[in-house]
């Protein structure tokens, strides 16, 4: 079965530090949850078909396995269940467009259609915004100082837009149609600290010049259809550009597939969250900050098929990091840091 972008998520690890469970939605509207036990795949639950494809999956209470809620969109309907598959929400939004982007935080539901953004508080309309071009992705972050997180839209007209409720806080133009946006955060630097990612100002003269975060700014990641990945530093008044990964500057002109999946995790265990990038040409990349504030490529694989979702976690072994990838055709592929494996595990 085919999968849409961001329709695969890893559930948080429980207190017993058992392997993480995985949920994935397909083009029939089913959501499947499974885990691994003694090396065997074990189905936890499977929902009935939803009549339309699962457009997006979002988790609420994402830091707590016991309380996590699994939310997904099918057409204009949002449904939710608990980690055992018991459905507790079926909400027809009555929107004019199918929901392609979804984010859930506490009682807030943020939903992006083709051109229309809607926000619901306890399933009641609370905000509305019509974008100037297609909404490709949606994230949230507390930027404006308002009590509720602000919505961040990545749009086809090359703009990243930050909304406070129904109001546009500001927008900024990128160097390509924005296909992915993601919240990003590292631990704040200790007083007097130095090293990668610390300090606000200019990078070394040999590198492109860009702003650095000194802890005052909220950080976002964005990806574009023409292959760029970049950092944005945001506060209540404006958006500043941080580093940018450009396929041309990196000498990778032939490897500039559009960014479909963007995630981050400290897979190198150096205290900085590494960038995980999945592209529409099947390229999987990990970028690290080991050597300075500009990310460096440390891992790359070509899967020969468009990547729709990408997460890091512990699915088959709690002692070794894994990159879990979902492809357009519904394949799930795991890349493990376990020395003895050598090869990736794959599930259809």
Predicted features along the sequence, with ranges:
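Beta-propeller-forming repeat regions
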Residues: 1-348
